[in-house]
Amino acid sequence: VRENVYVNCNKYYTILIFITMLFEISDGKKCDIFVHIFNHLKHFTDSIVLTVSPEMLYIQGMDSGHICVYELMLQSDWFQKWEVDNKQTYGISVPILNKILRICSVNQTIIIHSDNDEDLQIDFTSEEKGVLNKYLKMPLMDIDTDHLHIPDTEYDVDIEMDSKKFKNLIDELSNFNETLNIDCDGEQLTFESSSGEGTMNVIITTDDVELLAVVEDKEIKASYGIKYISQMCQFYKLSSTCAIHITQDIPLQLKYVIDGDSIMRFYLAPKISND
């Protein structure tokens, strides 16, 4: 396996560090997206296994209640520099990584690299005059985890709509209940939230969204926890649109296409009726 050389210089000395993994994000918008992901991932988990390979950065995990699965795939060409020769895994504390990433200033490049099994090094650099370069290090965690196999599924309802619009809709529905009821009679799709304080019904038609496709004559009644959907919607900045896929009695899928084949998606288990 080829080892790459990372050089860190200043006027006093030069240090050559033989690294086993390095990736870099210099595009300002992509830096914001990367920071945004971990800022909101902390609401699902305290720790992750970050897997890097020559092809991509991959994260998969489940919330503590085993209700929601999250999955992130950032292809190698999404990064401005990607130097990974073989598959490697890193156990990461999400709160610590989020704390570090929030130190990154506007117009700084994010460089993440490692040369051992104990630490992950994160550099924030800039060629702009007056912007201080920052070099941080965080300890790695020993985490045992297996990736879930998520089979491809043909859904009965496919919706594509503005991400911010969907987030606002879920925020409004959450005012009335902790449960989102979805009803489809083959012709009309309804989102409902109801409690003793009132009921909110939203009828969704093809005129309201980018795409609405329903299997002909298919009737669906499904319920999901609004709190989880609301947390999933916090990632709306990843993409201008989101895709929602629904089939009765199987997990709802919410997907953001970040760029090309780089995506983030969630699978949310339906609530089980007591009837």
Language-model-detected regions and their locations in the chain:
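DNA polymerase sliding clamps and clamp-related checkpoint/processivity subunits
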Residues: L16-K42, S47-N175, N181-D275
